[in-house]
Each structure stands twice: as structure tokens, then as C-alpha cells.
Amino acid sequence: MKKKHDGIVYETKEVLNPSPKVTHCCKSLWLKYSFQKAYMTQLVSSQPVPAMSRNPDHNLLSQPKEHSIVQKHHQEEIIHKLAMQLRHIGDNIDHRMVREDLQQDGRDALDHFVFFFFRRVQVLLHFFWNNHLL
């Protein structure tokens, strides 16, 4: 039986029973992102992360619920601190780039003035030389 949702036509049995290729793709994506999540958790956590199961059906809540809530809150605080540090670093880089742009604008104006001044001196000397005033 075919159904249509937002312009996408699909077989309901295909949604309920995905092909082995789709299942393998989903499992490999789950595996990839679960290891990335474990690595990020290890970066922000002071506690070591337990080894991840390769089975996506495995229950990840092996720790007591209270401990995991406290640990999650601690991790959120650390992530917030890291985000604020990254924001501060980004702001510093932005301010430095603005300052360098202003300095570059000042140098460009000075270069233009020096070029203009020496060009006028050269024209004046050329005038005196041609009229035998020197």
C-alpha cells in the first residue's frame, strides 16, 4: 500500500521493514556518531567513559539514574564554559581583525600622502630643471 507525505510517495511495508542495506547504513551511522559522542563526553568529563557497545539495541543506561543526571548536569556546565571560552576567543579574533583593518587603513592613507607629496616634489624639481632655475 502506497502512502504520500509532503510529496514523498513510499510503501508502508518498506518503512516498517527496511531493506538490509538501509539497516546496515543506519547501524554504521549510529556506530559512527555514538563513538563521536563518547569521545566528546570524554573530553568534557573528568570521569572516563565506559566502552561503547557495538550493538545499537544495547541499553546505555547501565549507571544509576541519579548519578547520570548529576554527571549530565556537570557535563552541561563544562560544555557551557567551553562554549563561553570559544565565544571569547572568537570575539578576540574579531576585535584583532578590526584593529588590523583600521591600522591598514591608516597605512594606506599614509602611503597615499607620501606618494602624492613626493610626486609633487618631483614635478617641482622637473619644472626648475627644465627652466634652468637650478
Curated annotation (Swiss-Prot):
It is found in: Peroxisome. Keywords: Peroxisome. One of its GO terms (cellular component) is peroxisome. The lineage of its organism: Eukaryota, Metazoa, Chordata, Craniata, Vertebrata. Its main location: other. A motif (Microbody targeting signal) lies at residues 131-134. It comes from the Eukaryota. This is Peroxisomal testis-specific protein 1. Pfam families: PXT1. The gene is PXT1. The keyword Translocase does not apply.
